[in-house]
């Protein structure tokens, strides 16, 4: 069994990597990928904590987080496709200059 600290450290590292991707990257697709990494890091923390205390609640929360991430990804990708069709660009600085 993996110790609690190792799993939580891995989840924290993944969360920081995702947060870095969201804050530093200017491309909306990479920002969406960073957000997905952050959601998966939180889900990993739930599984590790549930495994440590011998409860199935962590796995239930993992399923909930994955379904939330799937819904967020599908809506986000649909919006990105529409944005790319209209502006031919996914750079957040260029998109913020759109009129309307």
UniProtKB/Swiss-Prot annotation:
Q: Which UniProt keywords apply?
A: Cell inner membrane, Cell membrane, Membrane, NAD, Quinone, Translocase, Transmembrane, Transmembrane helix, Transport, Ubiquinone
Q: Where are the bilayer-spanning segments?
A: 2-22, 28-48, 60-80
Which is one GO molecular function term here? quinone binding
Q: What is its EC number?
A: 7.1.1.-
The family database entries (Pfam families) matched by this protein are listed as: Oxidored_q2
What GO cellular component entries does it have?
NADH dehydrogenase complex; plasma membrane
Query: Which family does the UniProt entry place this protein in?
Result: Belongs to the complex I subunit 4L family.
Subunit composition and interactions: NDH-1 is composed of 13 different subunits. Subunits NuoA, H, J, K, L, M, N constitute the membrane sector of the complex.
Any idea what this protein is called?
A: NADH-quinone oxidoreductase subunit K
Q: Which gene encodes it?
A: nuoK
């Amino acid at each position: 069994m993996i110790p609690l600290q190792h799993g939580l450290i891995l989840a924290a590292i993944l969360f920081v990597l995702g947060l870095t991707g969201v804050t530093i990257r200017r491309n909306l697709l990479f920002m969406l990928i960073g957000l997905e990494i952050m959601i998966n890091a939180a889900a990993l923390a739930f599984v590790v904590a549930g495994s440590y205390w011998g409860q199935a609640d962590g796995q239930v929360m993992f399923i909930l987080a994955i379904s939330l991430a799937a819904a967020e990804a599908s809506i986000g990708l649909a919006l990105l496709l529409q944005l790319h069709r209209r502006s031919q660009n996914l750079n957040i600085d260029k998109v913020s200059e759109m009129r309307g």
